[in-house]
Amino acid sequence: MRYLQIIFIAICCLSGFVSVNAQIIPDHFSRPAYSYRSEQNPYYWKNKKPFDGYWQQDVEYAIKAAIDEKTDIVDGKVVLTYYNNSPDALPFVYFHLYQEAFQPETYVEELNLSNDVKPTYGKYEGAGLGTEVTEVKIIKRNGKKADEKTTLVQDISVLRVNLEKPIQPGENITIEIPFKTYFDTGSLRRRMKKFKSGDFMHYDGVHWYPRICVYDRKMGWDTDQHLGKEFYGDFGSFEVELTFASNYIVEATGYLENEQDMMPRSLREKLDIKNFANKPWEEQPSVIIPYVEGDKKTWKYYAINVHDFAFTADPNYRIGESMAFVNGQQVKCVALVQEGHAAFWQNAADYTKKIIETFSRDFTPYIWPKIIVADARDGMEYPMLTLDGGYDPSYRDLLIHEVGHMWYFGMVGNNETYRASLDEGFTQFLTAWGYRSIDGDYRVQFPEDNKYKAKYRKPDEIMMSEVYYAYLN
């Protein structure tokens, strides 16, 4: 009964947060005509305050980054406009440098050692290189050019930036931060992954840029050290340019604004997942776009009403698409699969469509223009992007779970470190709900490989495996 009460409260909170003007969904295939802070944005908090006196901070990120496929280094610059909507003057701000956590002599190492796990480190991790920031400039204040000094104090994965002048209530500043982030392959569970994909590297760009900490009315500054777990971010907009070697296929949070240049029709047809329906599992991928040393492409994305930005990139991604319908608008459902797995991902995009439509119908409408499920040896969620793995039918509950995170983690965006169960608990409930709605009460499985298993193995009941077993254990 207590479990059901928590679920009921979570559903009510979610519906209240995103149902205001839920019928007004922007054109899902081009940048909206309004900005995040506009009165025309149906999801901007000032247009639907939950109570008088409520406030939260606003962010506008502009990021340009190049990913070097030879060194595995992201070289970039963040330009962040930060709006102080609080009643407090802020003499300093904090940033998360998440990748700094995965090094020797950090809290993550201490946590592992206390559990009798001795980490091993890659060359960058061992050298203390995660996300490197050496200077922070204040280049504008309230939209006017500025040149204000800052001093930096770093405590592992949290960077404090002391300002020359406080940010007064109602003011905004624009912050410029050059940075480098290093992909690596140590034993610690970094979500920012690289791994070999054919003759090239696969990259998952997550928690990869300096991200300003949340300042909220309950906790003040959120300066929790990163331990490889949950997250919390301010809502706003992201304008991001990602430069890769020209043979890479990239997807990310937001609208791809130069789609015709990056993915012309002729190329899209060659990359279609249906072309590889009979490809043997793990067979060497074909070459669709030849690698030319020094030849680059820049992928340009814009996202609004999100609190984070992530990307995934692989020369061997092949693409499936389906269209979900939410409140009369289309939501593009994209499946990215490594070519050697394509035969077992043929239904991924269509299955994702069913997930989006089920949760939008039964809970509250999905508000973004697309959702991506990616074959990335993982199980993690970011706005509009899930990093997954496996194959059909065993990956179905994983896809449901990770896409389900878009509702509480994505659209509500609570402080997961402080109240982790709000997202994970609600999403576990969604996993069981979604599976039963789409496939029925029992898990879809491959036929048993021998007659004894076929005779004696009981069907896997979804409510038992996804909900009740957690209490029995």
Would you name each region that the model predicts?
Residues 27-28, 32-46, 59, 301, ...:
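Hydrophobic alpha-helical and helix-loop surface patches within well-folded domains
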Residues 99-109, 248-251:
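Short aromatic-acidic-glycine turn motif
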Residues 1-25:
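Bacterial Sec-dependent N-terminal signal peptides
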Residues 73, 83, 89, 118-197, ...:
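A surface-exposed beta-strand-loop module
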Residues 105-119, 123-124, 180-238, 259:
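Glycine/proline-rich low-complexity spacer/linker segments in large multi-domain proteins
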Residues 212-216, 220, 228-400, 429:
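Hydrophobic helix-coil surface modules that form long, contiguous segments used
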Residues 25-96:
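Early extracytoplasmic/domain-onset interaction patches
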Residues 78-80, 84, 97-99, 163, ...:
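Short, hydrophobic/aromatic-enriched beta-strand segments in well-ordered soluble domains
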